Structures are given as C-alpha cells and as structure tokens.
Amino acid sequence: ALAAMLLLAPLLAQAQTQSPEEMIRDNIESFMSQINGKEDYYANNLDELKALVNESLNEVADFRYIGASVMGSYFRNATPEQRSRFADVFRQTLIDTYTRGLVTFDYDELRVLGQQRAQRHEDQASVDMEVVASNGQVYPVSYSLRLSDGQWRVVNVIVNGINLGLTFRNQFDQAMRDNNRDYDAV
C-alpha cells in the first residue's frame, strides 16, 4: 500500500498543481483525441459519445457548486434530496446538450488562449478559448473556475457572450415562480 501511494503521489501532486489553463487544455486535448476522425461513428452511437462526455465533464466540472449556483436563493430552502436530484438532472441535461452540440456543430479548431485576466481571489480563475467553425467564424468561450480541494473545477461557462450559469439561473427562477415554488415540479 505504501509503495502504491509513493507511485501515485507525483501524479496527485501534478493534478493539484496544474494551472487552470493546463487543466482545460489537457482535458480538451484528451477528449478530442478520442473523438477526432470518429464523428460519423459517434453520430450513430450517441450513448458511447455521452459516456465520453460524462467522463470528461466529471473530471473538470463542479456539478454540486453549479447546481447550487443555478438554484440561487432557492438552494437554501431545498432539502438535501431535492438539491441532489436537481444536480443530477442538471448534470444529465448538460451532458445531453453538449453531446448533441458535438454531433451537429461543424468546427475546425479549438484554441485555448490561456488565463487572460487577473482575478480578485486566489481560488478563482478564468480561461479563454476560441471555437473556430468550419466557415471561419470564431466563437469565444470563457471558463470560470474555482479551486476546490486542491483542484481547479469549472463552475461557469460564457459562450459567445452568453453567460450559461446566469441563463440557467434565470430559467430556474422562472420555473420556480411558474410552479408556485414547488421544487419537485421543477
């Protein structure tokens, strides 16, 4: 057991000291290496692609934090079961959406630009990226990350100027109002 810990320690230390930019770049490169050249295959085998997306997102996203953020002020009054159920449903919705996007969006290149802005807090970072479509149009993407348990985790994404976290929070708030604040109906 001690030998195994000694062998794993450098890998764990590397993961904990990896910069936000390196974490995003490594995750994207690893994921894309699994699907590049196999787009037609995955278009016909969506469950396999979903499994890859799930694995990739689980490595980088803080779904518990994202779920709490999307629930906003409603999070405090939700039961632990309601919080957990929402986080699971939200996570699956993101995986399904991302999977469909991978199959339908025609892109040529993904460029991680790096950490561009100074942050107010040491446990927060932003990493910018560009998605270059086949027609040459460039879509900016900005990942917001926070340091949690020694690892950088994605907590929000802004795509082409649209803040997804804020959009989902507004949708959740509206759904709660439409359903008389019934967590189970939302």
Which sequence ranges carry the predicted segments?
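N-terminal signal peptide c-region/cleavage motif recognized by signal peptidases
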Residues: 8-12
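Early exported N-terminus immediately downstream of N-terminal targeting peptides
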Residues: 17-98
